């Protein structure tokens, strides 16, 4: 009888490993091609700066986020995780990473979409911003070159002040995005988005704060 029970438990564990492997395989079939398209769309948007390219990039990111926002899939992952029966070390690690990825997206899909759209709008503004110094319109690379090589104090000041003007263009959008992200994080049981980001990337907020305090005291 005891042997039968042990054998049954072993089969149950093996089944849970199998269930998770199948979950990962199904997820990869959806995510891998979409991730490739998303990365290419983002690259094209960053290069062209065009409205339509940023819109396409946002759409792919929304599609990707909705995969990880799927409530049924998250319930399956949660069941697998809480079973404690994924015994393979690599699978267990994959389970932790995927669980955190899904958890961070378990919010209202409409709000998720709004955040992605706003984030994309901010990125577009940053991407297309040009600092005007005199009659010159400078790209980020040109600004970086001046700031890292020039010894002309006046020129350095003019370039730096011109570059800072991007702040006023994105300030309101950033404040709005911060508020939306914090509300989303609170709805998932976190204090704010900062805490959620750290914990879901497996970092301890207290330890991070302690580290920065130590750096400040150096």
Language model feature labels by segment:
Residues 2-5:
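C-terminal motif of bacterial Sec signal peptides marking the signal peptidase cleavage site
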Residues 10-176, 194:
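N-terminal helix-rich structural modules
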Residues 136-145, 149, 157, 175-218:
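Active-site-proximal, well-structured secondary-structure segments within enzyme catalytic domains
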């Amino acid at each position: 009888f005891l042997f039968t029970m042990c054998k049954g438990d072993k089969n149950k564990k093996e089944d849970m490993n199998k269930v998770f492997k199948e979950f990962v395989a199904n997820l990869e079939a959806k995510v891998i091609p979409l991730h490739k398209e998303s990365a290419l769309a983002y690259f094209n948007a960053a290069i062209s700066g065009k409205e339509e390219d940023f819109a396409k990039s946002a759409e792919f990111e929304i599609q990707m986020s909705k995969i990880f926002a799927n409530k049924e899939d998250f319930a399956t992952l949660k069941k697998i995780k809480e079973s404690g029966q994924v015994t393979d070390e690599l699978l267990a690690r994959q389970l932790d990473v995927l669980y955190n990825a899904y958890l961070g997206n378990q919010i209202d899909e409409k709000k998720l979409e709004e955040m992605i759209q706003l984030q994309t709008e901010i990125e577009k503004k940053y991407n297309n911003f040009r600092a005007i110094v005199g009659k010159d319109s400078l790209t980020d690379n040109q600004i970086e070159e001046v700031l890292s090589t020039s010894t002309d104090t006046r020129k350095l000041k003019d370039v730096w002040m011109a570059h800072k003007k991007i702040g006023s263009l994105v300030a309101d959008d950033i404040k709005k995005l911060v508020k939306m992200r914090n509300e989303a994080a609170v709805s998932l049981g976190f204090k704010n988005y900062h805490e959620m980001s750290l914990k879901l990337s497996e970092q301890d907020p207290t330890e991070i704060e302690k580290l920065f305090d130590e750096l400040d005291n150096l």
